[in-house]
Amino acid sequence: MKVLALRHSVAQVYADTQTYIHDDSKDEYENAFLISNLTTHNILYLNYSFKTLKILNKSGIAAIEVQSPDELFALIRCNFTYDYENNIVYLHDYSYYTNNEIRTDQYWITKTDIINYLLPGWKLTHVGYNGKNTRGHYNFSFICQNAATDDDIIIEYIYSNELDFQNFLLRKIKERMTTSLPIARLSNRVFRDKLFPSIVNIHKKVINVGPRNESMFTFLNFPTIKQFSNGAYIVKHTIKLKQEKWLGKRISQFDIGQYKNMLNVVTTIYYYYNLYYSKPVIYMLGSAPSYWIYDIKQYSDFTFETWDPLDTPYSTIHHKELFFDKDINKLKDNSVLYIDIRTDRGNMDWKEWRKIVEQQTVNNLNIAYKYLSTGKAKVCCVKLTAMDLELPITAKLLHHPTTEIRSEFYAILDVWDIITIKRFIPKGVFYAFINNVTTENVFIQPPFKLKMSPTDYIVALYALSNDFNSRQDIINLINKQKQSLITVRINNTFKDEPKVSFKNIYDWTFLPTDFELKDSVITSYDGCLGMFGLSISLSPKPTGNNHLFIINGTDKYYKLDQYANHTGISRRSHQIRFSESATSYSGYIFRDLSNNNFNLIGTNVENSVSGHVYNALIYYRYNYAFDLKRWIYLHSIGKVAVEGGRYYEHAPIELIYACRSAKEFAILQDDLTVLRYANEIERYINKVYSITYADDPNYFIGIKFNSIPYEYDVKVPHLTLGVLFISDNMVHNVITVLKKMKTELFKMEISTSYTYMLSDNTYVANVSGVLSTYFKLYNMFYRNHVTFGQSRMFIPHITLSFSNKQTVRIESTKLRINSIYLRKIKGETVFDMSE
């Protein structure tokens, strides 16, 4: 959903668009709630309130003030991520395909021959980080840039087994044009760029679990963040390999040597970060042309000092000369060294060239060892070739993708590697490594152990759900870790599957009820975005690869109506009820009937079940941005702080009724996941509320009326407004509550319209207009520790006779209250009050 705020209506009609005019009779929160439950994707919000826009954005719903037709057209035709704190719109708009254009935010790609393999007549455009270079295209009242690129296609091609780039590109563009937008993946970079600066500013020690190549630039500015990944491929792992020969397989039609070098250096930087937690100087030997340095400098400020007889245009200091052993003393501490020296073959005989390459490999290693043998805080990444060679058993081997699989690979060495045991590795084993292993991640840090880290802030985005982790260990970590942002795969299956497949692995699935948390928020991706200054125009698909975002130790926990709130809670219900259901009242009718309340007169006004909890359960796949457990818990302890809106405090029994309705709904729909979720939420309600039932009551509250429009043969026809189980010394507490509620009780608009047999030999009249007051009374008694109400549904009625009678229907008739009293069952009246 996107909300576009306009001062004036527009003449043009847009598909999937609805207009909402600000209702001045309601406050900003109520307007935000009403907007969020509209069913179209685009909302044109007229006569808007800035406060309402802010509320929507904090809820994760993109809401933007629009001041021109161009702005409206740009925003209504695509999806976007909105940085509402800095008023920046990041479009995810691929309409540039109509210019016969693909886009990249990586400069090095523009220096390759990729143009020869594009679709006929197409071009490649460099748009900068997150499309920053496109800002000049939009002369808007807000900062706007198009973050959409085709880098995902290019990178997927590089790692694929396909060689024909044009066919690959064509297929992927057609897929993009015929499938829903993977909005979470597209906006994730924007999210990470907001998330980590805010966390690092607050927390001294931050752990990040499971980063992938998509984050390779994000963390360059954060050397103190400790990364955990899948570990490195080290020399001693080669013992499992059988010897092979030179393969000579082409991987990419266009030259990706630049990409390989960038990945090698970035891998080395992050390896250095995990050892020394600071930024190094980067030395490079055999550097030309290294156009990718430009890419790194767009993200983070590094000093690159390079040696090569050819130009390296983007290095900080360039020595246009060869590097020799005698120059090693020029390399200072707190640095990384990238050695990429190899003579081009040219027209040289391959045997002669092979000898030169092997000698250069030995020389490269000697430079690496000498560099590491003196000084401190150093890491080296060195180019090697497949040959009989001794290497430290702990050396880290790299084989990032390059244009052709030939004989080259790389090793990362640190100061400890050079003093460890070396192992002789035959040439054939190195060929086996080169032919079969591709380094898929620039993060080669060790795996994360699922243990609490009390002084650290843990971030684990899409990293822990894999089934090679113990499910219970994941739960324990989340329950015990005081400060963290951790995601787990949500169970949005219909058969309550404990795990689901993802690519070539399996993920555990989770529901919010799997966790025992306090001071934590459990929400969706868009709900989490709202907590970090972002909002989004499109929620993830309800049955997609979605995750729960669990934020432990947040200062936003008690801001119940601002973050992870109830906005959008009824949206799916509205979509169903106003389109395909038997009546728009279907939800109200079902909730009452499933709790054996058959008086459906005014059911949409006077419903006996919490619609919030019911919708949050049966449509949780759509609205799990709403943190239901937090909402229940804060109500249970009486710490619901709200800024505005039409606030109604539910009685705990209303929540129980909602769970019962949701369970029956789940059974009818054969939705085993909702069935379990509703059962567990009901248990949670009973856990956090101290609910007691007057199933064996000794007192009741009665209401006597001036007159009853039916014949009766009971002594005093009355409405029982609830039964109690109390000791005699608690009578005073009950009377005190009744006196406090006196005005509200006598203001009830009570009416009746028919009679019926409640049970065999019990003939009663229906009563409408008391439920909302009954639940308020229930809450007051609950807060005063008075046992009020039974476990079965409260169905207001007036007993007329204890014999069988025929049903009578009359026009709805108001009943005027004569008195309200407290009476002991089979005893005397102990309190009576009149208006």
Swiss-Prot record:
Single GO cellular component term = viral nucleocapsid
- Provide the coiled-coil residue spans: none
- Which chemical reaction does it catalyze? a 5'-end diphospho-ribonucleoside in mRNA + GTP + H(+) = a 5'-end (5'-triphosphoguanosine)-ribonucleoside in mRNA + diphosphate; a 5'-end (5'-triphosphoguanosine)-ribonucleoside in mRNA + S-adenosyl-L-methionine = a 5'-end (N(7)-methyl 5'-triphosphoguanosine)-ribonucleoside in mRNA + S-adenosyl-L-homocysteine; 5'-triphosphoadenylyl-(2'->5')-adenylyl-(2'->5')-adenosine + 2 H2O = 2 AMP + ATP + 2 H(+)
The UniProt record lists the EC number as 3.1.4.-, 2.7.7.50, 2.1.1.56
Enumerate the residue ranges of region (GTase/RTPase activity). Answer: 556-692
Q: Which residues form the active site?
A: 718 (for 2'-5'-phosphodiesterase activity), 720 (for 2'-5'-phosphodiesterase activity), 797 (for 2'-5'-phosphodiesterase activity), 799 (for 2'-5'-phosphodiesterase activity)
Q: Which InterPro entries match?
A: VP3_Rotav
Question: Key word Hydrolase present in the record?
Answer: yes
Say if the entry is tagged with keyword Transmembrane. Answer: no
Assigned keywords, A-Z: GTP-binding, Host-virus interaction, Hydrolase, Inhibition of host innate immune response by virus, Methyltransferase, mRNA capping, mRNA processing, Multifunctional enzyme, Nucleotide-binding, Nucleotidyltransferase, RNA-binding, S-adenosyl-L-methionine, Transferase, Viral immunoevasion, Virion
Tell me the segments the record calls region 2'-O-methyltransferase activity: 246-428
Instruction: Please give the Gene Ontology molecular function terms for this protein.
Output: GTP binding; hydrolase activity; mRNA 5'-cap (guanine-N7-)-methyltransferase activity; mRNA guanylyltransferase activity; RNA binding
Task: Map out region (2'-5'-phosphodiesterase activity) in residue numbers.
Answer: 693-835
Q: Which GO terms describe its biological process?
A: symbiont-mediated suppression of host innate immune response; viral process
Subcellular location(s): the record lists: Virion
The organism's place on the tree of life at top rank: Viruses
Q: Where is this region: N7-methyltransferase activity?
A: 171-245, 429-555
Q: Return the similarity comment.
A: Belongs to the rotavirus VP3 family.
Subunit and partners = Interacts with VP1. Interacts with VP2.
The domain-related comment in the record is: Contains a bipartite N7-methyltransferase domain, a 2'-O-methyltransferase domain and a GTase/RTPase domain. The C-terminus contains a phosphodiesterase domain that degrades the 5'-triphosphorylated, 2'-5' linked adenylate oligomers produced by the host cell in response to IFN stimulation.
Function summary: Multifunctional enzyme involved in mRNA capping. Catalyzes the formation of the 5' cap structure on the viral plus-strand transcripts. Specifically binds to GTP and displays guanylyltransferase and methyltransferase activities. Has affinity for ssRNA but not for dsRNA. Capping activity is non-specific and caps RNAs that initiate with either a G or an A residue. Together with VP1 polymerase, forms a VP1-VP3 complex positioned near the channels situated at each of the five-fold vertices of the core. Counteracts the host innate immune response thanks to its phosphodiesterase that degrades the 5'-triphosphorylated, 2'-5' linked adenylate oligomers produced by the host cell IFN-inducible 2',5'-oligoadenylate synthetase (OAS). The host RNaseL is therefore not activated.
Protein's name according to its UniProt entry:
Protein VP3
Organism, as annotated: Rotavirus A (strain RVA/Human/Japan/YO/1977/G3P1A[8]) (RV-A)
